[in-house]
Curated annotation (Swiss-Prot):
Cross-referenced SMART domains: TOPRIM
NCBIfam families cross-referenced by the UniProt entry: recR
Gene3D superfamilies the record matches: 3.30.60.80, 3.40.1360.10, 6.10.250.240, RecR Domain 1
Record flagged with keyword DNA damage: yes
Domain Toprim, first and last residues per copy: 80-175
Protein name from the UniProt record: Recombination protein RecR
PROSITE patterns on file: RECR, TOPRIM
InterPro entries recorded: DNA_Rcmb_RecR, Rcmb_RecR, Rcmb_RecR_Znf, TOPRIM_dom, TOPRIM_RecR
Listed GO MF terms: DNA binding; zinc ion binding
Transmembrane segments: none
Gene for this chain: recR
């Protein structure tokens, strides 16, 4: 179907988002066209504001509007326990259960040789530097229970073995192939409680 150029560009923009195919992009584009102009402007401002004002924490790699982030800056947090997750959204999922009191390290990805992503392409070098500089006693590997997440957890555990730092892996109450962000608080809580040393 041939659309006027502004609609085509809007559809193309929506298709750049993960999980949005052509049909959904068309629906979203026409939804935006039906919105009040003020709502569209607010939406556009929110996008620009998020892009301009959010950054990654220089300590843990979590997305934040200040540096260090509110978690790293919280003196009540147990700085000796670092939970390693793949994405900022995984931190949000872990925080929802309101049980974990340590800090995080966000890798912003996972090792995936098929996609050409190696250890140097994600936040692993920063993790190693952080572990040298801080007095960390335990690293909890909370990467996703899929092939890439498991490979990443195994790689990190082998790297940390000589350091003497206790390395644990969250238990799998999580479905294999699933993502942390979709797990409910109870499942995440049980997975954290049942972590094992690796």
């Amino acid at each position: 179907m041939h659309y006027p150029e502004p609609i085509s560009k809007l559809i193309d923009s929506f298709m750049k988002l993960p999980g949005i195919g052509p049909k959904t992009a068309v629906r979203l584009a026409f939804f935006v066209l039906d919105m009040k102009e003020d709502d569209v402007l607010d939406f556009a401002k929110s996008l620009v504001n998020a892009k301009r004002n959010l950054t990654y924490c220089s300590v843990c790699g979590h997305i934040t509007d200040r540096d260090p982030c509110y978690i790293c800056d919280d003196s009540h947090r147990d700085q000796s326990v670092v939970c390693v997750v793949q994405e900022p959204k995984d931190v949000i999922a872990m925080e929802k259960m309101k049980e974990y009191q340590g800090v995080y390290h966000v890798l912003r990805g996972a090792i995936s040789p098929m996609e050409g992503i190696g250890p140097e392409d994600i936040n692993i070098p920063q993790l190693l530097k952080r572990l040298q500089d801080e007095t960390v006693q335990e690293v909890i590997l909370a990467t996703n229970p899929n092939i890439e997440g498991e490979a990443t957890a195994m790689y990190i555990s082998r790297l940390l073995k000589p350091t003497g730092i206790k390395v644990t892996r969250i238990a799998h109450g999580l479905p294999v192939g699933g993502d942390l962000e979709y797990a409910d608080e109870v499942t995440l809580s049980k997975a954290l409680e049942g972590r094992r040393e690796v």
